[in-house]
Amino acid sequence: MKNDNKLQKEALMRLSQLRFPFADAPSIVQAHQKDEQIQGLLIMKVTELCKLIKSQLFVNSYPKELSIFAKLLYLLFTTGRRGRTLGEEYVDLTYTNRKGTRLAGRLKMIVFAFAYPLCPYFITKLYKKIMKNNKESKIEDTESVAAFCKGLLDFILDVHMTLFYFKGAFYSISKRIFGMRYVFKHILSKNEANFREEGSQKYKVLGYILLAQNVMKWYPVLTSTLGSWIYGRKRTNDSITRSSVGLQERSEHESIEGIPKESQLTHINLSDKNQLPFIPEASRKCILCLMNMSDPSCAPCGHLFCWSCLMSWCKERPECPLCRQHCQPQEILVLRQ
């Protein structure tokens, strides 16, 4: 009886020591690229469906939201159901906890499926809203804090990607936060293990290159920040003394006044045939919103669209919607009589 218990304990110890190997960086990137390809097809289908149900204007107004919705659907029907995405099946990967001792829990995978596409979107929206409020209220301190937070996020992302190239553990920050790590769902043969080890070494070379790039990028920022912090009090006291003398005088000369509000602007709508009569009837509709142009604007290639339609389009994709020629928002010209 004692011998049987001893054998059972030894068997359990061996079973607990049996772990699937962690996935390497090239395999994780390969799975991610495959998922991006599938998500791109899904985004295209969702966009076409919204065109049929709503309109082209709706699709042009919410391209980012439609993309997020398609990615959320993809993750909910795969990861959210504790299954695997097509990219993970393609490379034969699955999620485990941070140490690789057990599979990731269902609740964690559901929360991750929501957080992965939605968190970056809401963070970006919040940052843009803060910056917009700062410009309207002219609060310099809050603007500097927002700029600092953006720089801090960029620094964290750079460090995160550098660690990934060296260790190959977490490809996204969301997975690092949730502690969801990839493992192969099969035992690697000797040849496959050697092949993947060679691929990991090549990614480490990229890690060293990225590390050198980040050092050159962030070293001047770090030194200037430390210098400002060391001499900040003295400079602040001097600036307060000097600015208190001529603050009112400078504000009177440097402030910009008389900027009209949006409601005070004169808009041109081509539904009125007296507006820009040289434009023929067949060319007076915007192909983006399928309505008569409002404030007709010209891209560098010469094609005409509504100001708001073309500006929204170029912010997402800097190109002409018709001929795909390069078009930056600052290159758009508004037509006037």
Swiss-Prot record:
Changing residue 324 to A: E3 ubiquitin-protein ligase activity. It comes from the Eukaryota. GO terms for biological process: proteasome-mediated ubiquitin-dependent protein catabolic process; protein import into peroxisome matrix; protein import into peroxisome matrix, receptor recycling; protein import into peroxisome matrix, substrate release; protein polyubiquitination; protein quality control for misfolded or incompletely synthesized proteins; protein ubiquitination. Residues 55, 139-145, 223-337 are cytoplasmic. Zn(2+) 2 binds at residues 301, 303, 320, 323. Changing residue 288 to A: Abolished E3 ubiquitin-protein ligase activity. It is an enzyme of class 2 (transferase). Pfam families: Pex2_Pex12, zf-RING_2. The keyword Cell inner membrane does not apply. It catalyses: S-ubiquitinyl-[E2 ubiquitin-conjugating enzyme]-L-cysteine + [acceptor protein]-L-lysine = [E2 ubiquitin-conjugating enzyme]-L-cysteine + N(6)-ubiquitinyl-[acceptor protein]-L-lysine. It is found in: Peroxisome membrane. One of its GO terms (cellular component) is ubiquitin ligase complex. Changing residue 301 to S: Abolished E3 ubiquitin-protein ligase activity, leading to impaired peroxisome biogenesis. The keyword RNA-binding does not apply. Keywords: Membrane, Metal-binding, Peroxisome, Peroxisome biogenesis, Protein transport, Transferase, Transmembrane, Transmembrane helix, Transport, Ubl conjugation pathway, Zinc, Zinc-finger. SUPFAM superfamilies: RING/U-box. It is a multi-pass membrane protein. Residues 1-24, 78-105, 167-202 are peroxisomal matrix. The chain crosses the membrane at residues 25-54, 56-77, 106-138, 146-166, 203-222. Its EC number is 2.3.2.27. One of its GO terms (molecular function) is zinc ion binding. Pathway: Protein modification; protein ubiquitination. The three subunits of the retrotranslocation channel (PEX2, PEX10 and PEX12) coassemble in the membrane into a channel with an open 10 Angstrom pore. The RING-type zinc-fingers that catalyze PEX5 receptor ubiquitination are positioned above the pore on the cytosolic side of the complex. E3 ubiquitin-protein ligase component of a retrotranslocation channel required for peroxisome organization by mediating export of the PEX5 receptor from peroxisomes to the cytosol, thereby promoting PEX5 recycling. The retrotranslocation channel is composed of PEX2, PEX10 and PEX12; each subunit contributing transmembrane segments that coassemble into an open channel that specifically allows the passage of PEX5 through the peroxisomal membrane. PEX10 also regulates PEX5 recycling by acting as a E3 ubiquitin-protein ligase. Component of the PEX2-PEX10-PEX12 retrotranslocation channel, composed of PEX2, PEX10 and PEX12. This is Peroxisome biogenesis factor 10. It comes from Saccharomyces cerevisiae (strain ATCC 204508 / S288c). The lineage of its organism: Eukaryota, Fungi, Dikarya, Ascomycota, Saccharomycotina.
